[in-house]
Regions:
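Residue-level preference for the first positions of well-ordered beta-strands
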Residues: 2-6, 30, 71-75
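Conserved GTP-binding G-domain of TRAFAC-class P-loop NTPases and closely related GTPase folds
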Residues: 1-4, 8, 13-16, 21, ...
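Short catalytic-loop micro-motif centered on adjacent basic/acidic residues
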Residues: 73-78, 102
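Amphipathic alpha-helical transducer elements in NTP-driven molecular machines
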Residues: 51-59, 83, 107, 126-133
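Acidic, metal-coordinating catalytic cores used for nucleic-acid/nucleotide bond scission
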Residues: 76-89
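Conserved substrate/cofactor phosphate-moiety recognition/catalytic segment
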Residues: 13-72, 111-115
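A short, structured active-site edge motif that brings together acidic residues
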Residues: 35, 102-109
Length: 146
């Protein structure tokens, strides 16, 4: 049975590092990442204009992988702090009967995420990470009520 691991956390929390290590240990695993798709479509720049395309391509790629394999593991290596985004991923997974696991990186302190991000070639920026942290607080509050 196929398995999808949805990574969740702020930029700089270690999601991509974890995903790369997972793939070293599990060479048949796939990583889907919207940042990588943005690089192909828009030179890595985020824009509202292309973001819907990026999300649609990621969902389509997930569907293609799940339909084309029997025992794949797919890592969704994005922040995944938006409930609508997570629900869209879950719909694809459920429709194709894939096992789903959430792997969160919520334990990484905000200041550490900001520091790690500042060392990147293309940093997201502290104001964006702080804004995403506010989304994360809302997300965790919603999840705790389930």
């Amino acid at each position: 049975m196929n398995k999808v691991i949805i990574l969740q956390g702020l930029p700089g929390s270690g999601k991509s590092t974890w995903a790369k290590q997972y793939c070293k240990e599990n060479p048949d695993a796939f990583i889907l990442n919207r940042d990588s798709l943005r690089k192909m479509l828009n030179n890595g720049e985020w824009s509202a204009k292309t973001e819907e395309f990026v999300k649609a391509i990621e969902l389509s790629a997930l569907e293609i992988i799940l339909k084309g394999t029997d025992n794949a593991t797919v890592l969704i290596d994005d922040t995944n702090l938006n409930l609508k985004t997570v629900n869209n991923l879950l719909k694809v997974c459920n429709s194709l009967e894939a096992d789903v696991a959430l792997k969160d990186f919520f334990h990484v302190p905000l200041h550490e995420c900001i520091e790690r991000d500042s060392k990147r070639e293309k940093p997201v920026g502290s104001s964006a990470i702080i804004r995403m942290n506010e989304e994360l607080i809302k997300f965790k509050s919603y999840i705790s009520k389930l």
